From Swiss-Prot:
Keyword set includes Cytoplasm: yes
Function, in words: Catalyzes the reversible isomerization of glucose-6-phosphate to fructose-6-phosphate.
Listed PANTHER family: GLUCOSE-6-PHOSPHATE ISOMERASE
Name used for this protein in its record: Glucose-6-phosphate isomerase 2
Encoding gene (name): pgi2
Organism: Cupriavidus pinatubonensis (strain JMP 134 / LMG 1197)
Keyword Isomerase among UniProt keywords: yes
Reaction(s) this enzyme catalyzes, per UniProt: alpha-D-glucose 6-phosphate = beta-D-fructose 6-phosphate
InterPro entries in the record: G6P_Isomerase, G6P_Isomerase_C, Phosphoglucose_isomerase_CS, SIS_dom_sf, SIS_PGI_1, SIS_PGI_2
Pathway membership, UniProt: Carbohydrate biosynthesis; gluconeogenesis; Carbohydrate degradation; glycolysis; D-glyceraldehyde 3-phosphate and glycerone phosphate from D-glucose: step 2/4
Recorded superkingdom: Bacteria
């Protein structure tokens, strides 16, 4: 149990000692320059400045001691070795093998996986090339112009985010669309813009039974059949990412066009697998390989760099420091990079579904807070929305600023303004503004002074990418995966299962039948009343 470790107890005492120390005091004179240099780490084209955190040398020493006592490095090595680190499902968590090079030698539970991974990548490459070149055609012989990815959770968020992030430099190819929600509006508005004869659907569901995905897939199939596509032609317009060959064939998809993946690939870690088929189609397979290469570079860094120079290790330790010892409830992710506007949502699933747990590996209750709420939007938009709370609110919210050194457009002056605002926000959170400084500015009467004071002492990381391309994005995402793993190891929880999503899905099935007219089942009074109201409304509109 992590909370019983001596380093954990020492960190509790240490947190109480420095809770009211202001970071401004650590940035005066030469010590500030030394701190900035000491608390900056570079790897894989990423630079992390974590100097603006509420940590001293003693804090860091204790955090690294906690990592040793919690055996984080040994747990990491077990994950890379393909051991069953997903303890509740007795599975390996070997997403790193998806971006491996020949000879890296990954094994899942002792079984080599390189040949299987290589075979699927080759299948993906052929498919992406055929679709992008126009040699894959629809039923009437025309090239595919639009590809719709139907999936949810990890089968949607990761590919959607990557395609959005890298779309600016993508060579011409088919347009990509993503449908996830079972709300019919999501699918209807997408299909309304498309020509069935030149549309291809990728259905992503490991079991081919996911409720939302299969409801959308069946509706899409009906749409094709209403728009001139025959049952025998459906195979030209559907492919599947799944492991359920029989269900895929029964749906009408040629099993030859089924792209498999494995039970050692968790959904939120799966964009590197066949789940990333939409990415390969959108950006081309060469750039998909670059995405994998960036992730592999970060894998090697995480596996081999000492903890004090290890990006995922440092970030995971800081996350636990704030959540478990300083009591923060959330973390803001602010990419000052418009193409990364979906990154906060991706990280939200990655961290909160992985570590939103209250029991440890052995089933014992966790005695510390886990999985901070991850949220945010792009800068500078966030400055005009929620940054008021981050600067002057009553709760402490650590911020991750993410920026790219190379601009994303040729418009003069925009990128310098973007970077200036990013760096200024971090400085403002650190420094704050005292009442004396407000008075010295001479712009406010005394009654207004308290409203213009900024406490400061609000922590942030700044992560700089050399440029936003496939390689650096791959490194950034793999770093986030490993950061999440470090959090879980420190809390002694399993970051690779998600039992918490199951109960609601199970309860939805009988409710759906009741809404369709089946006899009422036992529910709490509130839920029963909601079902009656919805059923009565539906009946009155029939």
């Amino acid at each position: 149990m992590s909370t019983s470790l001596s380093a954990w107890q020492s960190l509790r005492e240490h947190a109480a000692k420095i809770r009211h120390t202001h970071m401004r005091d650590w940035f005066t004179g030469p010590q500030g320059q030394a701190r900035s240099v000491r608390l900056t780490v570079e790897a894989c084209g990423l630079t992390l400045d974590y100097a603006k955190n509420r940590v001293t040398e003693d804090t860091l020493s204790l955090l690294f001691a906690l990592a040793r006592q919690a055996r984080v490095c040994e747990r990491r090595d077990a994950m890379f070795a393909g051991e069953p680190v997903n303890t509740t499902e007795r599975r390996a968590a070997l997403h790193m093998a998806l971006r491996a090079h020949p000879g890296d030698g990954y094994r899942a539970l002792g079984v080599p996986v390189e040949a299987d991974v290589s075979a699927v990548l080759a299948q993906m490459e052929r498919f992406a090339r055929d679709v992008r070149s126009g040699s894959w055609t629809g039923f009437d012989g025309r090239a595919i112009t639009d590809v719709v990815n139907i999936g949810i959770g990890g089968s949607d968020l990761g590919p959607r985010m990557v395609c959005r992030a890298l779309e600016q430099d993508t060579e011409p190819g088919p347009r990509l669309h993503f449908v996830a929600n079972v709300d019919g509006y999501d699918l209807a508005r997408t299909l309304a813009r498309l020509d069935a004869a030149t549309t291809l659907v990728i259905v992503c569901s490991k079991t081919f039974t996911t409720l939302e995905t299969m409801a959308n897939a069946r509706t899409a199939r009906d749409w094709f059949l209403r728009h001139g596509v025959t049952h025998s032609d459906l195979a030209r317009h559907f492919v599947a990412v799944s492991t359920n060959r029989d269900a895929v064939a029964a749906f009408g998809i040629d099993p030859v066009n089924m792209f498999p993946f494995w039970d050692w690939v968790g959904g939120r870690f799966s964009l590197w697998s066949a789940v990333g088929l939409s990415i390969a189609v959108a950006i081309g397979f060469d750039r998909f390989r670059q995405l994998l290469d960036g992730a592999r570079a970060m894998d090697r860094h995480f596996a081999g760099a000492p903890p004090e120079q290890n990006l995922p290790m440092i970030l995971g330790l800081l996350d636990v420091w704030y959540r478990s010892f300083l009591g923060t409830a959330s973390r803001c992710v602010a990419p000052y990079c418009e193409p990364l506007d979906l990154l906060p949502a991706f990280l939200q699933q990655l961290e909160m579904e992985s570590n939103g747990k209250s029991v440890q590996h052995d089933g014992a209750a966790l005695e510390a807070g886990s999985a901070a709420v991850v949220w945010g939007t792009t800068g500078t938009n966030g400055q005009h929305a929620y940054f008021q709370m981050v600067h002057q609110g009553s709760q402490l919210v650590p911020v991750d600023f993410i920026a790219c050194l190379q601009p994303h457009s040729d418009l003069p002056g925009h990128h310098t303004k973007l970077l200036a605002n990013c760096f200024a926000q971090g400085e403002a959170l650190l420094r704050g503004r005292t009442a004396d400084e407000v008075r010295a500015e001479g712009k406010a009467d005394e009654a207004l002074v308290p409203h213009l004071v900024f406490e400061g002492n609000r922590p942030s990381n700044t992560l700089l990418l050399q440029r936003l391309d496939a390689f650096h994005l791959g490194a950034l995402l793999a770093m986030s995966e490993h950061r999440t793993f470090v959090q879980g190891a420190l809390w002694n929880i399993n970051p690779f299962d998600q039992w918490g999503v199951e109960l609601g899905k199970m309860l939805a099935r009988p409710i759906e039948r009741e809404l369709e007219g089946a006899p009422p089942q036992p529910h709490d009074a509130s839920t029963a009343a909601l079902i009656r109201r919805a059923a009565q409304f539906c009946a009155s509109t029939d």
